[in-house]
Amino acid sequence: MDVQHPPGVSSGTGDPGPSAPALLTWAAMAASKTAPGRKPGPAADPDQRVELLRAAAMLLAQEGPGALTVRRIATEAGYSTMGVYSRFGGKDGIVEALFVEGFHGLGEAMTGVPETDDPLTDMLGCGRAYRRFALDHPTSYAVMFERVVPGYEPTESAQIMAHGTFELLVGRVRRAMELGALPVADALETAQRIWAACHGWVSLEIHGLIKIDDPDGAAFERSMVALCGPIELSAPPPRATRASAPRSTRRRG
């Protein structure tokens, strides 16, 4: 089944594989989607949450946020609207679940990068995992970072969970500093700069705004290497002094 993504969100190309967490990939949702109008029996009730989230993800991917109503979600999943309210409390609860599951999947992708004796390579691996997750799951990425559903704001608990994913990068940066691979500085600030650069590149790439041919991510990785190289990321650039400023050689008339 071809999945149509909302305007401004391109389709992913990767296959998450059988080990990817449920509900994190829209391609997997499309492949296993049940037919609208199915009426599950009692034995299927434990799958109600999965089916409702799958239906919400499909609607968001195929038709955009305007189609994301409690009635449409329930119809697509083959349940009554009461099922949506009893499981999630309403539409915002479903979007919240998609938000949380997305960060859970991103966290698993980043923790899947092993620690080696080369912490900069490990950090690059985390950046690579971040990019791959975003390109493979662009709609999930949009829910997580672009607030594509009008009116939805993550709850405090969801934001704490999302921040935990960022802390994974902070830990990698701190380890690189401890091992001498990065100059000792504020690990939180340094990680924020790295994340901002990574997120900016990936967001532009998802929206088709990277105007270079980079299918294997080589240009992305060169950018990350330059950022993580022997530069004191948290130090301001040196300021030129009057004594060091070049003098003009042009004669005054």
Show which residues each predicted segment covers.
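N-terminal intrinsically disordered/low-complexity leader segments
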Residues: 1-47, 58, 235-253
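Helix-turn-helix
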Residues: 51, 59-93, 97
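Amphipathic alpha-helical linker/stalk segments
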Residues: 100-125, 154-163, 174
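Amphipathic C-terminal alpha-helical segment
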Residues: 133, 171, 175, 195-213, ...
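Amphipathic alpha-helical packing segments from all-alpha helical-bundle domains
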Residues: 154-179, 188-192, 218-221, 225-229
